[in-house]
Each structure stands twice: as C-alpha cells, then as structure tokens.
Amino acid sequence: MTSADRTPQPARSPDPGADAGADAGPDADADLGPDPGPGPGPGPGPGPGPRGPVVPVVPVVPVVLVVLARRAAGRCLSFARRPYRDRPDPAYRVRRWPDLTALCLATVFFWSSLSPSLVPRPWYLQGIVGGITAAIGYALGSTLAWLFRTVVPRHPGEGFRTRCWQAYWLLAPFASVWLISESARMQRRLRVLQDLPPSLTWHTPMIALIALALLALALLLARLVRLGAVTLIRLLGRLLPRPVAYATGALLTALAVLVGVRDLVYDRGIVDVADRIAAATNGGTKAGIERPVSRFVSGGPGSLLGWDSLGYEGRNFTGSTPTRAALTAWSGRPSRDPVRVYVPSTPPVAFADDRPFAAQAALAVRELDRTGAFDRAVLAVAGTTGTGWVDPNVAEALEHMYRGDTAIVAVQYSYLPSWVSFLVDKEKAGQATRALLDAVRARLDALPEDRRPRLVVTGESLGAYAVEASFGTVDALLAGTDGALLMGPPDFSPISRELRRDRDPGSPVWRPAYDDGAHVRFGQFPAADLARPTAAWRHPRVVYLQNASDPVVWWSPDLLLDRPAWLSRPLGPDITPEIRWFPFVTFWQTSVDMAVSYGVDAPHGHRYGAGAVDGWAAVVPPEGWTEADTTRLRAYIGHRRAAY
C-alpha cells in the first residue's frame, strides 16, 4: 500500500494532557469500542502498557426510582407497624389524625348508603349520598368517642390501637370496593322492576372518590369551626373565669355557625340563586308555545290578562289548549273550545287587594264569567306546583272526555321550584287555592242548582297539597266538591296523611283502603286498582294516584330516626326486596331520590302519565262513557307528545 492510500492521521500532541482533553468530549465513550487488549502505552515510545480501569456509567433516572421506591416501601412498612399518628405536641388545638371510632362509623354509614332505595339513582348521586351519610356517621362516631374518653379514664394501649387500625386498613378498602360493585347489581334489579333497561353505568372509583371528597370537606369545615371555638375560648379565658369562657365561646361559635348557615348559605346562597334562576325562567316562553287565538283562554283575545303577564307556566298552560277542531277530529263528534283560565302570581294593579290572594281569586272569577265557564258541564279547580305548573295530561284528558265542554282554572302563587317553595312559602299553596275555591263556590251558589257545572278539584305533587290544605279533612272535601283527582301528594298533605293513618286493617300503606272504598280509593295501576275493594263506590268520588315508589309521597323528616310503614311487608309492586331502613341514611337516600324521581316511566317514581284518564273516568264520567272509550283515550294521552 502506498502512502497515498493511507488515511491521513492528525498530528499527535506531545502533551499527554492535550490527549486527555481532546478525548473528554461527549462521544468519548462511544469511540472506545471493545477492549483491544495490550497496546501502546499512554506515554511516548513503543511497547505495551497497562490500560486504566473503565468506570461503568450508571443512568441517573433508575437510581432515583430505586431510591424513591425504597423510601416509599420503608414508609409503608413503618405505617403498617403503627397505622395512626398522635398529635406531635399536646398544645395542638385540633386533632390531626382521624378518630378510629368515627372513621369506622363513617365507613358503615357509607356502606349502608349503597343499599337500593325507591328509584334507581346514577353513580354520581350515589357518591353524593355516600359522602353525606359518611360525614354524619363520622360526626356520631366522634361524639361517641369523645363521650367514652370523658367517662372512661383508662384508654386502650398502643398495641391494641395498632391492631385495630391494621384491621381497619386491611378490611375497609376491600369491603368498600366489593359493596360498591354489589350495589350495581341491586340497582340493575331495581331498574328491571321499574320497566327500565338493566344497563347501568356504575363508576366504582368515582363513587368512592366523591364520597371521600365530601367527607374530607365536611371534616375540614368541622375542624375549622372547632379551631375557631378553641381559639375564642382561650382568648376569653384571659378575661373571664374558665367555665364562663367555655360557655360563652361555645355559645358565640354556635351563633356564628347558625347565622352563617341561615343567612349566607341558605338565604343569600341557595334561595337567592334559585330565585334568580326561576325568575329568569318565568320570563321566558317554551319553544313551540304561541299566544292563543281563542277568546275562551286567558291571554287570548278579550282576556283581562295580557299574554306576557302569565309567566312561563301560565303561557304553557293556556298556549297549549286543544282546539275545537282537534277535539272533534279525535272524538268524531261536535266539540267546543275548552276554557282555560290562569291567573299569575302578580295580578294587575287594578285588582289589588290587601287580603292574600283575594285579588287573584276575584280576577279568576271575572275571567270565568267572561269565557262562559259557568255554562260548561264541568268546572275544574287545579292546584299548581311551586312553579305554577298544571299537568297537561290531567287537563287534556278531561277536555277530550267531555269534548271541550269544560273549564279549568288555576292560580299561581309562586314561580319557585317546588322544593324551594316547600322550604320558603309552603303555606301559600293552600292559601291561594282556598281563596280561589271560596270565590268560585260563592259564584256557583248564586246560580240555580240545575244550571251549575259539576265542581271538581285536581292537583299533582305540591298542587295536591294545595287542594288538601284548602279543605283540611276528607269530609269537607266530599261535602264541598263533586269529586277530586289527586296525584302524588307529599307526605305532609293533611287529608292523604289522615287516610293512610286510618286505613282499613290489612291494607298496606302504599295502597290503603279507607272505609271499604265507599268514596275514596287509591291506585298505582288505576285500571285494576280502582276496582278494589269490590264494595259499592258511591259519589262523590275521590281518586288518589299514588305510586309505591314515589319518594315525594314518602319523604318525611321522620325517616331520620323512625322506620316507615311503607317498608313493611308486603312491599309495593315496584319496590326491591333488598331495600332496608337505616337511621339517617334512608332519609338522605329518599331526599336524593326526589331529584331523580322523574327519570323513570309512569307509573313509577313521581310519574303518573295517562293514569289521569282512568281517574277522571272514575270521578266524573260523561254520560254514555264506556270502558272502551277509556282505553282509547288512555292510549292517546300516553303516546302523544305533550306540549310542555
């Protein structure tokens, strides 16, 4: 090989340090390759020389992970040996580590909340009810532990506490996961009972996380309150004797919490926000609802009430009135334009009156006179819910049954949702309906008996309560009307509560028989239920549509500590046999159930669907009305698309 074929080599530096510096670049290790064995030494001159030791390069990231893993394992082992912590200094004002007794009771309450209730609930509401009940359980457990420490001078030793904590951490997480998974099976069974698809989305980790987050939030708030109380007591202790400082500090703290919850959270928070949302909704109009062209409807031509003044539910009610042509097409016989009168919560100034709801009642009678309502075959007074809602199924069923020869009148007392109205002004429901009934009956009394329309009353949910509160007793209801159709009355409704309490022996509370069904009957599946008992059913008649699974019917503060009668055997037809009563827990389950009671199909939950057809057919059947007519109208009402 000639010298021209050789690869040019860089000149070698005579300084060994220069070589070292040149080889110290980032790719120095990559150029080494495999060990060539003995070779020229590092210094000048030929001859083999020893190669220096190669130091292996260890990656930094795996080393860090190993160190962290060892540290975590050490802490886990340390925690396993002593799975709790005491306050590092007795001067700490608030306990830092949870109390074992309280945590155990919180866990038991959470497990209890996983049991099924009246209607299926989604996973996120299960997490909410689990967190609320766990917080209640923690509060009770903490109170019991404090009482025990106060009464018993000797405390368990460290070894016993360690074993108890170890048992808790070993059992509680696994049991919670298994019970959450088992609750999904129970929810699917309940869905099948209530004619829903068995498919269900049930996020076990999210349920646990939501419950833990709510429990942690409640615990944080409680400890902040306690810290404030202890700090206040210590400050007062510098000025007052110790007992007086304790009493004064506790009283001031309780007062501050009460004022904060009542004024800030409840009044300015929940109620104020709900009022603003409801007021904005009340000013709108549902898509598809238009101003009526019939002079027989409030808000129409010649009405004493402007269309814009009726409110959201008033416009829904009057703007969806069926026409004479539609009623004729359905019945095949000549029909009339039905009368619908609706008076909003704020009547025109010209009808102002100092008496509660007297102005609205007077205006309603004026509208009834204007539309010729007292010349119709049936006049129905409808109690409204908190928002002013009237069930369209109830109204249209009566109008189709009588081919429009009807008049329906309602007065709005609030635009708030029913649950807010119940909390704020429940009494207004009864006052408004009573004022309307008094005014209507006074006008009817002025007519000859043979020219009076049949007077019936109806209402659903808080509207049913409004009707019942107007009469007070079942005897007054029977004496003052020609019949009543009431659906889903809340537990605090006076008449239905009396009927369930004084029911005939042997009849269940969810389907009570009263006075052998002489005038009043209850039903969930009215086509069959209203035929029982077999004794004669005399007029006037009262029909209650009451679903066994309706949480609105059964919710009561008594659920906190008392086992309800509706959980006694036999259970209702759509109640799962796996339902149980637990103190405090069942109350919150039923409270949450009310929020989803419209998520099922009729006749389950708080949905009554076309049951109004059977109800009206039993209470005030038109002359010549047959069972076939009821079946046909039930199918129509049940399958048509409601206007609102």
Residue ranges and their predicted role:
Residues 88-453, 473-644:
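C-terminal His-loop and adjacent cap/lid subdomain of alpha/beta-hydrolase
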Residues 457-464:
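Gly/Ala-rich beta-loop-alpha elbow adjacent to hydrolase catalytic centers
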Residues 464-475:
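Short glycine-enriched nucleophile-adjacent loop
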Residues 8, 48-93:
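Short, Lys/Arg-rich, polar N-terminal cytosolic tail immediately upstream
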Residues 36, 69-72, 81, 637, ...:
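Generic low-complexity, intrinsically disordered sequence content enriched
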